[in-house]
Amino acid sequence: MRYRYFAGVLVAAVLLLPAQGLAQHVVGTPALTDGSDGGFQVPLNTDPIYRLPTGRAGDSGFYTAAEFVMLTQTRDFGSQTIAVRGFFDSAGALTGVPGLFVGSGTEALNTRDLSRQSYQPGFNVEIGYRFDNGMRLFFNYMQLIETHASLGATLVPPLFRGPSGLADSFLTAPVFNFPPNFAGPARKVAGFGDYQVYGIWNGASTMDIRIAQRYQEMNAGYRIPLLETDYSRIYGAAGGRFAWFFERFQWWTASYDLDGNLQPQFAARYTNTLSQRMYGPFLGCGHEIFILNQFSLSTDLTAAMLFDVAKIRAKYQLGDNVPADISTQSKFGREEFRIVPNLNAAVNLWWYPVEGVQIRVGYQALMFFNTLHMNEPVGFNYGNIDPSYKVKEFRLLHGFNAGIGFFF
């Protein structure tokens, strides 16, 4: 009877006294970092509980992410004089020598004066699927909003200064070999007869130049875990990449007549477009470390060998709304092909506020080698347009990103 009593007391003590369970977190050890599900687990916020339709980041399933990016790239083109102040006495009416220049010849418009750098806002979206073993299939797309820089010159020189006769109130560019459609107004300079100052670009009133740039990138591939511990993981990535640099230079010229009137056929437009689409495989790796409760820091590096298809297009044409019977244009185009090495690097700080939600902010740099750039965007020979392009050894886009992702 005595033994039965002690046995009953022992059983009650085992059942009622608190003990450590397998699902309990012991003070001093990181929660949910045992890697038992095959992926890196950042501690989750369980107090309070948010009823969101998301899953755990370590579980298999679909995920999606969107972020804002703000990147900058330099505008690299050479120094080319577009226009000077004065005009050519094309008929020799004033100077007695056809083609002699009248005026100071002071530079009025040069491509080097365009803004060399600006930030481009944009977005990056990604969708993918995560498997139980930690491997991910993904597709992402980044688009930067087109950015512009412009510059202009008019008939008013700085402080109204210039030689007597007001020759510097006219702008001239050395365009030649153009058809009569681009003759411009019959009379635009006082004291000269009809077409004695010949051509829209000779003795013009206003000129404007503008450069536009944009960038797009797409990646499709997979990411696999390589090495994991309770506090960090190393992973590899591979796939295909598409990158696209688009640049367009535009130049508008307006030549008013002697009475200050502007007809559609008295204006001309020049356009130079450089489009570089690049395709190729990429290979990379990344490292993520747990630094604080719900926070981690990651670094990523990918290298790609891209095949660049560069399309070059340049065109002279009359202004808008020109009658069809006098409308004309001159076109130039060619393609170039080259190999462009590419290196992308990123550093991101991650925050995991609730299950299935990830927020990150970071910095990224996109480096390209052996791309083309406009050295002298304008070819002044209307009949044989030949702008100058050169190889740019190094091109850099860099800036910041911030976004959010969801696991389902």
Model-derived regions: residue spans:
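Outer-membrane beta-barrel biogenesis signature
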Residues: 23-65, 224
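Outer-membrane beta-barrel strand-turn architecture
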Residues: 58, 131-133, 226-230, 289-293, ...
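Hydrophobic, lipid-facing positions within transmembrane beta-strands of outer-membrane proteins
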Residues: 62, 121-125, 216-220, 279-283, ...
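Transmembrane beta-strands of outer-membrane beta-barrel pores
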Residues: 70-74, 141-145, 240-246, 303-311, ...
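Extracellular/periplasm-exposed beta-strand and loop segments of Gram-negative cell-envelope proteins
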Residues: 77-85, 91-118, 145-214, 245-277, ...
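Extended serine/threonine-enriched, polar tracts that run as long, contiguous segments within proteins
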Residues: 276-358, 366-368
